[in-house]
Regions:
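Switch II (G3) loop of P-loop NTPases
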Residues: 120-126
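Active-site beta-alpha connecting loops in nucleotide-dependent enzymes
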Residues: 105, 129-132, 136-179
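Short glycine-centered, acidic/aromatic-flanked micro-motifs in structured strand/loop junctions
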Residues: 67, 122, 151-153
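Conserved cofactor-binding/catalytic machinery of classical short-chain dehydrogenase/reductase
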Residues: 80, 126, 130
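Acidic, Mg2+-coordinating active-site environments of NTP-dependent enzymes
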Residues: 1-120, 144
C-alpha cells in the first residue's frame, strides 16, 4: 500500500489480515461475494452453469449482471475487476457487456470434455483456497454427481507449506488420484 499515490485507491478482499494506515492519503475499499463489503454480491443465482447477481457498490447497485463462466472464484474476480473499473470511471453498461462476454483463461475451470457420463475440467488451482473454491463450484454446478479429482502438486515448498490446507480442500472430493 505504500506505493499507492496520493488520491489513489486500494481495493482489497474483505477479511484479509491486513491493517490500514488511518493517515493514508488514499481511499480503501473492500470486496466480497459472501459478506457485506464496499463492493459485494447480492442475489446470486446459479442458472445452467452461469451466475447472475447484483453488484452493490458504495453508491449504487448494478442489477442482474451475468457471468457466463462457471466458478465462484470467477465471480469473486469479476467483483474485484468491476470495482477497479468503476473506480476508474468505466460505465455500468461496459462492465455488464464485459462480464457477459468473458470466456475465461486457459486452465481455469477449462472444460475439455462434457457428455452425459462425465465432465473433464482442467483447473490450475495452486493454492488450497483456489482448490476449495473450484471443487465447491463443481459441486454447485453438478449436484448429485460423483466428483473425482486428479491432483498434481507443484513446487515441493508450496505443497509442504500448504499441506494441511490442500488436505482439507481435497477432502471435499468423492475420489482422488494423486500424481
Amino acid at each position: 500500500a505504500s506505493q499507492i499515490k496520493e488520491g489513489g485507491s486500494l481495493v482489497l478482499k474483505k477479511g484479509l489480515p491486513v491493517g490500514f494506515d488511518p493517515s493514508a492519503k488514499y481511499k480503501s475499499y473492500t470486496y466480497s461475494i459472501t459478506e457485506p463489503a464496499d463492493f459485494c454480491v447480492e442475489n446470486m443465482e446459479l442458472k445452467d452453469g452461469y451466475y447472475q447477481f447484483d453488484l452493490k457498490t458504495p453508491e449504487f447497485r448494478i442489477e442482474k449482471l451475468v457471468l457466463n463462466y462457471p466458478g465462484l472464484l470467477n465471480v469473486e474476480n469479476s467483483v474485484a475487476a468491476s470495482a477497479l473499473a468503476l473506480l476508474a470511471g468505466v460505465s455500468h453498461d461496459a462492465i455488464r457487456k464485459a462480464l457477459a462476454s468473458y470466456s475465461g483463461v486457459k486452465r481455469r475451470f477449462d472444460i475439455h470434455l462434457k457428455n452425459e457420463n462425465f465432465i473433464l475440467i482442467d483447473d490450475y488451482a495452486h493454492h488450497p483456497e483456489e482448490l476449495r473454491a473450484t471443487i465447491q463450484s463443481v459441486r454447485d454446478i453438478y449436484r448429485g454427481r460423483t466428483i473425482t479429482g486428479i491432483f498434481q502438486p507443484h513446487l515441493f515448498s508450496r505443497t509442504k507449506d500448504f499441506a494441511e490446507g490442500f488436505a482439507k480442500s481435497l477432502d471435499l472430493l468423492d475420489e482422488i488420484v494423486l500424481l
